[in-house]
């Protein structure tokens, strides 16, 4: 999806569109491994200017199995909206089911990671490994 909008500043009070989302800023908080947890996202949002924040990488299978680590990564609150979740995995059905689950609990966007070169992600067929076939 492409973000479009009018002003050139970081927010300026004008809404921009990201697919169906109307955002107050063209700045997005990208996923940063080990950092983009709920407290970090809230601090960044409090500073201001963020239109959409994204979680750290979440393993689709772990999310479907309701593993505590995966649930902690998607932890959110009303002040942390809109929120995108970055999913990784290698089984299409698990990716689909995880995306459907995330949509059902109100996540604004799903980001499928197909670029992470980290060994532990690629060795299970996720991240950049998805682009090899």
Please report, for each region that a protein language model flagged, where it lies by residue.
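N-terminal, post-signal-peptide segments of secreted/periplasmic proteins
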Residues: 20-21
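Short, ordered loop/turn segments at secondary-structure junctions
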Residues: 58, 115-117
């Amino acid at each position: 999806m492409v973000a479009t909008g009018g002003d050139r500043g970081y927010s300026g009070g004008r809404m921009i569109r990201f697919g169906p989302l109307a955002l107050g800023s063209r700045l997005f908080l990208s996923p940063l491994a080990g950092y983009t947890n709920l407290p970090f996202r809230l601090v960044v949002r409090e500073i201001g200017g963020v239109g959409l924040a994204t979680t750290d990488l979440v393993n689709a299978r772990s999310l479907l199995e309701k593993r505590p680590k995966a649930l902690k990564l998607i932890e959110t609150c009303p002040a942390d909206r809109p929120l995108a979740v970055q999913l990784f995995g290698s089984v299409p059905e698990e990716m689909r089911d995880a995306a459907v689950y995330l949509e059902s609990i109100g996540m604004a966007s799903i980001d499928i990671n197909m670029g992470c070169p980290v060994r532990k992600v690629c060795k299970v067929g996720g991240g950049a490994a998805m682009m090899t076939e």
